[in-house]
Amino acid sequence: MRKKRYLLGEIYKYCVNFDVQLIINNDYNLASLYEGSGVHIGKRDLPIKLIKSVIGTDRLIGFSCGGEIIDLNQLKENGISYYSIGAFAKSLTKTNAEELTQETIKKYCDNNDLPMCIIGGLDMSNIESAMKYRPNMIAICNGIFNQDKDRIKETIKKFQEIIDAKS
């Protein structure tokens, strides 16, 4: 745990330096330790009101919908800041995640009153397809880090160019 907190502290400093908000997955207690950081939760996590009582009401709280259709109005009423849907494609990070159907993605796009994040299996082969749905955010893991270390920076630049062109 000490190493985890040290590494997170270093990541937090990096985020502050580049004016990027740190979002911590599931661990709202950990998020409460870093000013301005947010937390991303799922259906099985504690009630949103309890999480807000720990981290504060001004923090971002994201919610994973997975592939289910969730009532976005209820999420908004409960104080969710954004939601994510996925997996967009086969994911190496969450191997048990089912791929979204186009119909499910379109339903979310049509009912989109909250910022939407597309997550899961995004890489150079499908990022343009994902961007056609005009998400507010995307989450990429293996599409960046599942390659030679010396190509990561170049890959991030390519993703950024595609995202900027489609935004």
Regions found by a protein language model. Name each.
Residues 2-12, 16-28, 32-34, 38, ...:
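Conserved alpha/beta-domain cores
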Residues 4-23, 51-66, 98-124, 158-167:
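Alpha-helix-loop-beta-strand connector modules within alpha/beta enzyme cores
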Residues 9-10, 30, 87-88, 109, ...:
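Generic signal for short, ordered secondary-structure residues
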Residues 14, 34, 58, 88-91, ...:
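A near-ubiquitous, low-amplitude feature marking generic local secondary-structure context
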Residues 22-37, 67-81, 111-112, 116-118, ...:
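Catalytic cores of alpha/beta
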Residues 34-36, 41, 63-106, 110, ...:
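Glycine/Thr-rich beta-alpha phosphate-binding loop at enzyme active sites
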Residues 43-50, 84-96, 129-162:
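Glycine-rich phosphate-binding active-site loops on the catalytic face of alpha/beta enzymes
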Residues 46-55, 76:
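Short, charged N-terminal helix-start/capping segments
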